[in-house]
Amino acid sequence: MHHTQPSSVSITQVCETGEVYQLDEIKKISDVTHKHNLNMHMDGARFANALVSLDCSPAEMTWKSGIDVLSFGATKNGCLAAEAIIFFKKDLVGNVAFLMKRAGHLLSKMRFVSAQLDAYITNDVWLKNARRANDMGKRLSEGLNNHSDINLSYPTEANEVFATFPRNKIDHLNSEGYTINEDEWDGKAVRLVTAWNTKDNDVDEFLEILKKSN
């Protein structure tokens, strides 16, 4: 009575460590969630990156694995402030349009934001963008792995790389214009993110600068 009542379980795909939930993991979490009469939500801010990483269909990663509601993200894959809510259980829709309005998610001329999603999925642009970002993440991760004093914190499964750097390398990167936050200086993992428009030479230039700090 005096506590917030649970109504759903939410997972982030790709998750906060840059790792990807496998299909069987999503299914197991969903099964437990539904067993307790809760709804299963997926935060898909990097949905396309996860999809490319798993090489599966959108259906396999969502409703076939027990997802009830998906936040379909596009902002982190080439769009501007464009997201969509997808319900796989119609009875959950309810008054979501009113809630969106109340929460300030209906902008004036919203159609110009929404129109991006049409272009986003046409000719698999969203998957091509995600594949590029993931490939660059892998390229960066492999390059960092060549440094004995740099440790990868987690496996690189999409477009986020977490690694700890020695102070001399952080100082050198800062001097070259790559700003590393102070709270990441002393042995804490630095998050490096590659994007849909990251070029090979962007990654190679970063790695070359690191070599000069040895």
Each language-model region and where it sits:
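Conserved PLP-enzyme active-site core in the AAT-like
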Residues: 1-176, 184-198, 206-213
